[in-house]
């Protein structure tokens, strides 16, 4: 006799199962009969609802799938259309608000009603155009005039002596010589003559 496998160990589960079957056999038979009846009723109901022709069945299935796909596409297109409309409305509102803010920030001139981005640009405009304030160079002997302080300061800060020379002085081969600005700047063919002198001054009224 084998010590590892005691006797009747293999036959015990079989005996337990057989005794359980003998006790519960009538209940199991009733359950099987009920399940068979239910399955038969379901099959008869399904067969009465479905048409006999297989072509009609396939056509119905195809039409249902087509209707479902069309409904899904319509829902998606409506959703995408709504999102696009919302984005367009938001961008238009943002553009409107940004243009309104830009218009509010801009400053208009009281005299000519031109608009400028800030008060500094408006001040430069009024002093240069309407008040005709001219700013002369601070270097002695230069005498050049500018419409804005910025350009005057940029000119004055440059140490190049050629920039600060008077307009009437020109460089010749040997040194400095005095000449009239009309003769040096304009050719003789543009000058009208001594009887009708050309007014080249930029003093606008």
UniProtKB/Swiss-Prot annotation:
GO CC annotations on file: nucleus
Any one Pfam family match given in the protein's UniProt record, by short name: zf-C2H2
Tissues with expression: Expressed in the VA and VB motor neurons and at lower levels in the SABV neuron pair.
Zinc fingers (C2H2-type), renumbered ranges: 107-130, 135-164
Record key words, sorted: Metal-binding, Nucleus, Repeat, Transcription, Transcription regulation, Zinc, Zinc-finger
Disordered, as annotated region: 145-168
Protein name: Basonuclin zinc finger protein homolog
Organism: Caenorhabditis elegans
């Amino acid at each position: 006799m084998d010590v590892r496998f005691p006797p009747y160990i293999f036959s015990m589960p079989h005996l337990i199962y057989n005794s359980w079957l003998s006790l519960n056999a009538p209940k199991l038979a009733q359950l099987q009969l009920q399940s068979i009846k239910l399955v038969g009723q379901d099959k008869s109901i399904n067969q009465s609802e479905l048409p006999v022709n297989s072509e009609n069945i396939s056509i119905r299935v195809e039409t249902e799938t087509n209707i479902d796909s069309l409904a899904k596409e319509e829902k998606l297109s409506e959703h995408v259309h709504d999102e696009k409309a919302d984005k367009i409305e938001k961008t238009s509102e943002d553009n409107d608000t940004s243009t309104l803010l830009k218009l509010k920030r801009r400053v208009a001139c009281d005299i000519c009603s031109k608009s400028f981005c800030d008060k500094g640009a408006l001040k430069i405009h009024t002093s240069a155009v309407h008040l005709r304030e001219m700013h002369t160079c601070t270097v002695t002997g230069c005498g050049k005039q500018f419409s804005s302080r910025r350009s005057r300061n940029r000119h004055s800060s440059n140490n190049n002596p050629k920039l600060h020379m008077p307009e009437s002085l020109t460089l010749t081969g040997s040194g400095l010589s005095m000449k009239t600005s009309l003769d040096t700047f304009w050719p003789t063919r543009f000058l009208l003559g001594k009887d009708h002198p050309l007014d080249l001054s930029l003093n606008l009224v």
